[in-house]
Amino acid sequence: MRVRYKPWAEDYLKDHPELVDMDGQHAGKMTEWFDKTQPIHIEIGSGMGQFITTLAAQNPHINYISMEREKSIVYKVLDKVKEMSLTNLKIICNDAIELNEYFKDGEVSRIYLNFSDPWPKNRHAKRRLTYHTFLALYQQILNDEGDLHFKTDNRGLFAYSLESMSQFGMYFTKINLNLHQEDDGSNILTEYEKKFSNKGSRIYRMEAKFHSQK
């Protein structure tokens, strides 16, 4: 997705330090950032925030983190958080490679990867969020019962991710090869998902865990 640069976005985000971490001020203190101590779920690459804000509104007993590096998108997530008065959702404006700088070992209960960039060229495989270096970060911060939820419309990325996770020592608790035909009604749409599923795109989804989190 091409992002149109918003020169004012950075200042807008900096005006809300209680909701947005721009420079790691809450690194290692995620639990303390929230009003209540509750399980933490993360979405990496939240886009405009429809998915994560819907989850937060539906589940006040869970604390959510939206992690998105593009400042010109993050402001839309912030707008939704303010409009919906969500106290259980915070935003990190940074790259996923910094995850273990923010979260302690075993601090997270769930990670969502929704419609991540497929980086289709082989030379860019290291940038895929299901490449083994990222999986190692997820394993580090997830607790023993924690899991990873992955959703994409890119068949190649889905196949790659299944293989990458299997080779890393993960197992799958759920796999959907055509989510919108198999959905039990619990699926929450992202903005991207709604747009492309209406055009007939097939959506792939999986849930996975590590055999040994540590």
UniProtKB/Swiss-Prot annotation:
Annotated residues for binding of S-adenosyl-L-methionine: 43, 68, 95, 117
GO molecular function, one term: tRNA (guanine(46)-N7)-methyltransferase activity
PANTHER family: 3-DEOXY-D-MANNO-OCTULOSONIC-ACID TRANSFERASE/TRNA GUANINE-N 7 - -METHYLTRANSFERASE, PENTACOTRIPEPTIDE-REPEAT REGION OF PRORP DOMAIN-CONTAINING PROTEIN
GO cellular component: tRNA methyltransferase complex
Pathway involvement of the protein, from the record: tRNA modification; N(7)-methylguanine-tRNA biosynthesis
Keyword Secreted: no
NCBIfam families linked to this entry: PRK00121.2-2, tRNA (guanosine(46)-N7)-methyltransferase TrmB
This enzyme's EC code(s): 2.1.1.33
Purpose of the protein: Catalyzes the formation of N(7)-methylguanine at position 46 (m7G46) in tRNA.
Organism whose genome encodes this protein: Staphylococcus aureus (strain MSSA476)
Active site annotation, chain numbering: 117
Broadest EC class assigned to this enzyme: transferase
Protein name as annotated: tRNA (guanine-N(7)-)-methyltransferase
Annotated keywords: Methyltransferase, S-adenosyl-L-methionine, Transferase, tRNA processing
Top-level division of the source organism's lineage: Bacteria
Family label: Belongs to the class I-like SAM-binding methyltransferase superfamily. TrmB family.
InterPro entries: SAM-dependent_MTases_sf, tRNA_(Gua-N-7)_MeTrfase_Trmb, tRNA_methyltr_TrmB_bact
Coiled coil: none
Residues annotated as binding substrate: 121, 153, 190-193
Catalytic activity: guanosine(46) in tRNA + S-adenosyl-L-methionine = N(7)-methylguanosine(46) in tRNA + S-adenosyl-L-homocysteine
